[in-house]
């Protein structure tokens, strides 16, 4: 339903070259007929800075909230499988959520007040 997403991370090498590139697996379909939905979802690009580089997400994203179990946090539906295959899920999810919040204009929150994100250090 959501297509394939790639993440590219530049860790700030002296040559400014991309040293890590990996793909997030295609999400499992959660809709009986995904083709009409997929054709209507416009691909978007979100970039967020991290220490010594940035994380960029690109693809046709759909966001969810309480009505699909997001519990108030914007989630990328169907991407859980891919994040789990791509390394530390919590850190990747936090980077992604921060990028989305910046894109839609939500100011950053105080990292000390955030709950459930103790694995991420403030930058």
Swiss-Prot record:
Alphabetized UniProt keyword annotations: Viral matrix protein, Virion
GO terms under cellular component: virion component
Example GO molecular function: structural constituent of virion
A Pfam family this chain is assigned to: Rhabdo_matrix
Residue ranges of the region described as Disordered: 104-123
Chief localisation class: virion
Family per record: Belongs to the novirhabdovirus matrix protein family.
Name of this chain's protein: Matrix protein
């Amino acid at each position: 339903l959501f297509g394939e997403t790639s993440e590219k991370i530049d860790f700030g090498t002296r040559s400014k070259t991309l040293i890590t590139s990996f793909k997030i697996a295609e999400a499992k379909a959660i809709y009986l007929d995904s083709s009409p939905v997929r054709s209507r979802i416009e691909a978007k690009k979100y970039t967020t800075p991290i220490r010594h580089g940035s994380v960029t997400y690109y693809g046709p994203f759909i966001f969810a909230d309480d009505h699909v179990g997001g519990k108030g946090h914007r989630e990328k539906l169907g991407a859980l499988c891919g994040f789990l295959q791509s390394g530390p899920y919590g850190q990747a999810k936090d980077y992604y959520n921060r990028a989305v919040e910046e894109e839609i204009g939500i100011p950053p929150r105080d990292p000390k007040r955030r709950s459930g994100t103790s694995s991420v250090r403030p930058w």
